[in-house]
């Protein structure tokens, strides 16, 4: 007689914990798999949330140049060392990363400088 999924689930409902552990072990050995994959997926999700709390590198993103495009271009030039044409193209293509991989304090400092000349900036 062939077993179907319902038969297996019914057996599992009535099985003792040790029987289920033995079944899992037998499945792991027979098929060369591990039940730890399901556990690590849940662990990775919780680790991901703590990683965002412990972020060490930040990107400064220019969201828009606001009303003072020329002043923002000048500030972007001084921050990045780009030429006039490159800085203008960068500012006009907002939202765009101005600097990446900065410490939190450096990113906040750049944000303040850009906001002081009228830009809308995010730190991510």
Curated annotation (Swiss-Prot):
The keyword GTP-binding does not apply. Forms part of the ribosomal stalk which helps the ribosome interact with GTP-bound translation factors. Is thus essential for accurate translation. Keywords: Ribonucleoprotein, Ribosomal protein. Homodimer. Part of the ribosomal stalk of the 50S ribosomal subunit. Forms a multimeric L10(L12)X complex, where L10 forms an elongated spine to which 2 to 4 L12 dimers bind in a sequential fashion. Binds GTP-bound translation factors. This is Large ribosomal subunit protein bL12. GO terms for biological process: translation. CDD domains: Ribosomal_L7_L12. Gene3D superfamilies: 3.30.1390.10, Single helix bin. InterPro entries: Ribosomal_bL12, Ribosomal_bL12_C, Ribosomal_bL12_C/ClpS-like, Ribosomal_bL12_oligo, Ribosomal_bL12_oligo_N_sf. Pfam families: Ribosomal_L12 (PF00542), Ribosomal_L12_N (PF16320). PANTHER family: 39S RIBOSOMAL PROTEIN L12, LARGE RIBOSOMAL SUBUNIT PROTEIN BL12M. One of its GO terms (cellular component) is cytosolic large ribosomal subunit. It comes from the Bacteria. GO terms for molecular function: mRNA binding; structural constituent of ribosome. NCBIfam families: L12. It comes from Borreliella afzelii (strain PKo). Transmembrane segments: none annotated. Belongs to the bacterial ribosomal protein bL12 family.
């Amino acid at each position: 007689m062939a077993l179907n999924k319902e038969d297996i689930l019914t057996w599992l409902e009535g099985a003792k914990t040790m029987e289920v552990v033995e079944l899992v072990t037998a499945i792991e050995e027979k098929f060369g798999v591990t039940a730890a994959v399901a556990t690590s997926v849940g662990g990775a999700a919780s680790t991901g949330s703590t990683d965002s709390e412990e972020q060490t590198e930040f990107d400064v993103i220019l969201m828009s140049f606001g009303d003072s495009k020329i002043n923002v271009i000048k500030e972007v030039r001084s921050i990045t060392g780009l030429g006039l044409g490159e800085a203008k193209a960068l500012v006009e293509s907002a939202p765009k990363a101005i600097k990446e991989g900065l410490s939190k304090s450096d990113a906040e400092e750049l944000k303040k400088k850009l906001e002081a000349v009228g830009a809308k900036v995010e730190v991510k």
